[in-house]
Amino acid sequence: MAIHKIRAFFNLEASGGIVLALAAIAAMIIANTSLNTWYESFIHAPVAIQIGSFSIAKDAHHWINDGLMAVFFFLVGLELKREVLIGELSNVKQIILPAGAALGGMIMPAIVYLFFNYNEPEFWRGWAIPAATDIAFALGILSLLGNRVPNSLKVFLVSIAIFDDIGAIIIIALFYTNDLSLGSLAIAGLCLPFLYLLNRRNVTSITPYLLIGVIMWVAVLKSGIHATLAGVVLALFIPLFDRTDPEHSPLEELEHDLQNTVSYGILPLFAFANAGISLKGAGFGELFHSVPLGIAAGLFIGKQVGVMLMCWLIFKLGISTMPKGMNFKQIYGAALLCGVGFTMSLFIGGLAFAGETPLFDERLGIIMGSIVSGIAGYMMLKATLKDEVNVTSVDLTRHS
């Protein structure tokens, strides 16, 4: 009986978001109790890998953020490739609206953040933190509404998140890269022809790709570019189809194999390692510092304004039309859910303010903005979709 209940839970579309939320809540509770010492020891525990004279030594926190999150970005890359080649993003007309919405949803939060910090140039580097959307949380919240949610709304939200991920990848590569090591970068670059050759020769075994991918990840890690980007690049070379057997898709097979590991292992572990905010001794200044306030306002206000403004502009100019089965109220609900930045915002925040002084904690703003956006989006869509159901039932009665 218990096993059936566990299986039923993991079959829920919302289960990934629920596990992620529980991991974050657990981290916050532990960080504010006597267990905080254990928590700090866990995330700062030294972990080293040594092969001969070569070694990589980092603490657990960095291994999670640089290593395990590379697997997450690898999965994101696989999803991007599939969607662009055969999915929702394969048609130019289909991608204009979510692409525009994602662009607006990245620009406006950054503007809001910079408005809050315009007198503090040293904090400007946090501008990209509220530009992100956490698709696991957003879809988890959306799935709580059950089968009332039209498929077009799910596709719209997922498409925005995909373009959001593309934007985040570009931002990390361009703005959060340290001093470059050209030698390491050259080694990473040398991996690309080998990956291309494997793809062109229709090598469908994943093992050689992963072996080269590990070498590329180490080189990128040493180069100064964030190591997670190696995961995205590797994903682009995984074959979508086996040319000798069109029914076999190595990419989709790998995507399926990684989904549960990422959703129920890597992302919750990342949330646990990054959301442990200790509020002991935190005063008014720390809680209402311009950085966390700017992030929270960027996620809640900037996201919805940016997404809605771009959608309105696209409709007004006749560039695209309203997706079938959707209306402006539903788009607004989706725009609110886009303000749930959690995972990617925490990730970018760790890059922007690594080793920052205790004047503020950017994670407070991420959590505040994400919670308010999630609740507001859920309430808006619950009311809107309920209205839609009621309208439908009235129409059916009228025509009977």
Swiss-Prot record:
Main location group: membrane
Location within or outside the cell: Cell inner membrane
GO biological process, one term: regulation of pH
Keyword Transmembrane helix (UniProt): yes
GO cellular component: plasma membrane
Thylakoid keyword on record: no
InterPro entries hit by this protein: Na/H_antiporter_dom_sf, NhaA
Keywords: Antiport, Cell inner membrane, Cell membrane, Ion transport, Membrane, Sodium, Sodium transport, Transmembrane, Transmembrane helix, Transport
Catalytic reaction equation(s): Na(+)(in) + 2 H(+)(out) = Na(+)(out) + 2 H(+)(in)
GO MF entries: sodium:proton antiporter activity
Bilayer disposition of the protein: Multi-pass membrane protein
Transmembrane region(s): 10-30, 60-80, 95-115, 126-146, 155-175, 178-198, 218-238, 265-285, 295-315, 334-354, 364-384
Function: Na(+)/H(+) antiporter that extrudes sodium in exchange for external protons.
Family statement drawn from the similarity comment of this UniProt entry: Belongs to the NhaA Na(+)/H(+) (TC 2.A.33) antiporter family.
Protein name, per record: Na(+)/H(+) antiporter NhaA
Source organism of the structure: Psychrobacter cryohalolentis (strain ATCC BAA-1226 / DSM 17306 / VKM B-2378 / K5)
